[in-house]
Structure formats: C-alpha cells, structure tokens
Amino acid sequence: MSIEFNHTLVHAKDTWAAAREVAGVLGLPEPTSYGPFAVLQFDNGATLDFIEDTGEIKAQHYAFLVGEDDFDAIWSRIKEQDRQFWADPHKHTAGEINHGDGGRGLYWEGPDGHWLEIITRPYGSADPGGSEES
C-alpha cells in the first residue's frame, strides 16, 4: 500500500495575500489559481491550498522540512522582514533557533495567526544520544 500526503486547506482572510506571504518567506514561486484556491506546490507534490474564510480563523501549524541552504535563505528573509521568530512553539526563546535532532529549526507567526515552522531534520531522527530540541 502506498499513501502520500497530497494537500491541505489554509483558511485566510485574504487568500492571495496569505499565499503570497508564505511563498515569499519560503522562496517559493508565485501561487497558482485552482478554483477558489491560491495554491503553493512543494517539491514532493503536496500543496497548501489557501481559501478565503470570512469567519473566525483557528490558527493551525504548518511545518516544512528544508535543506541547510534553504534554511539559511528563509531565516535571512525572516530577519530582513523584521519578523519575530522562536526556537520553540511556546514562544519562550525569541530570536533563537533550535538544534533538535542535530538539525536546525525555528517558528514564526504567519498570516492569520498560523504558526509556521522550518526544520532541517525531522524531529525524532537523531541517533540515540544525539542532541535534543532546545
């Protein structure tokens, strides 16, 4: 059996502004249009499909596995845009990154309060005795 993640919806007050904001920070191409969606496509074929929501938006968490060079580029854009970032999801370590499982990671607040994260190694992927998330 083969099961792959394909897409998820991201609720936004302004569909295109939110999709462009995320694309800009991540260094992705301009979103494409598919019906009511502004779509960001990733290298593995999965998509984030941004859709307008006029009601109260419940913030969600979206994490992206990135290479070391991409991490550096994204982190630079976050700093250039004067965005706050944290090493942890509880906002205890502002302006720092984590080194979970021997990689690097950080969190920032994206459009409509969604919590975005980049990591260079999946959590839980370190060898026994490896570094833990800080």
Describe the role of every protein-language-model region.
Residues 22, 75, 120:
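Short, flexible helix/strand-to-coil boundary loops that buttress conserved ligand/catalytic motifs
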Residues 2-4, 55-59, 99-100:
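Short glycine-enriched loop/turn motifs at secondary-structure junctions
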Residues 48-51, 107, 116-119:
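Conserved beta-strand in the GNAT
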Residues 31-33, 88, 118:
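Residue-level detector of high-confidence beta-strand sites
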Residues 16, 64-115, 123, 129:
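Vicinal oxygen chelate
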Residues 6, 26, 36, 60, ...:
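Residue-level marker for the onset of beta-strands and adjacent loop->beta junctions
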Residues 1-17, 61-62, 122-134:
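N-terminal beta-strand motif that seeds the catalytic metal site of vicinal oxygen chelate
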Residues 2, 9-48, 52-55:
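Core segments of cupin and vicinal oxygen chelate
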